[in-house]
Amino acid sequence: MSKKILTYIICFIASLACSKYSSGNDMDGNFGYISKPSTILYIYGGKNEEDYLGKLNASKYDSESIWNEYGKYGNKYNSKSIWNAYGKYGNKYNSYSPFNEHGSNPPVLRDKNGKFYGYFTANKYKSKRANYDLIDVICENYEEIREDVGDWYDKIF
């Protein structure tokens, strides 16, 4: 094999290892780059999207953020919080919960103008599922996240 081809192969492999799409976490539990929406997304749940559930990717200091443990939507005891294990949207067995792997009525993600960005769901077979690493990280770790939302915000963002 020529040096030029070998160099290209090595560069290609190195670029894959450093890819911005790598979503693994480091030894401290911090996540590398994960794909996140570039615009703030609002979560709506319920049969007709009648329940506002907070902002998916806002700062943990935003009062409407799901990452603000002192706010309505980041508090694991609030009925409109996805972190409430006993609530409609946080119980993994409820069809309206994003954490139900077979859920048929998961929350939707919309921007401030109402544009649809997909379903927020652990159900990987749901048509029009939101395709962000952030969704995967949340759905795979929600039980741990709900115990320390602020710390997880720091790990992810």
Where are the regions a protein language model picked out?
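Hydrophobic h-region of N-terminal signal peptides that target proteins for export
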Residues: 11-19
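Positively charged n-region of N-terminal signal peptides that target proteins for export
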Residues: 1-5
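Repetitive, compositionally biased segments used for assembly/scaffolding
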Residues: 21-157
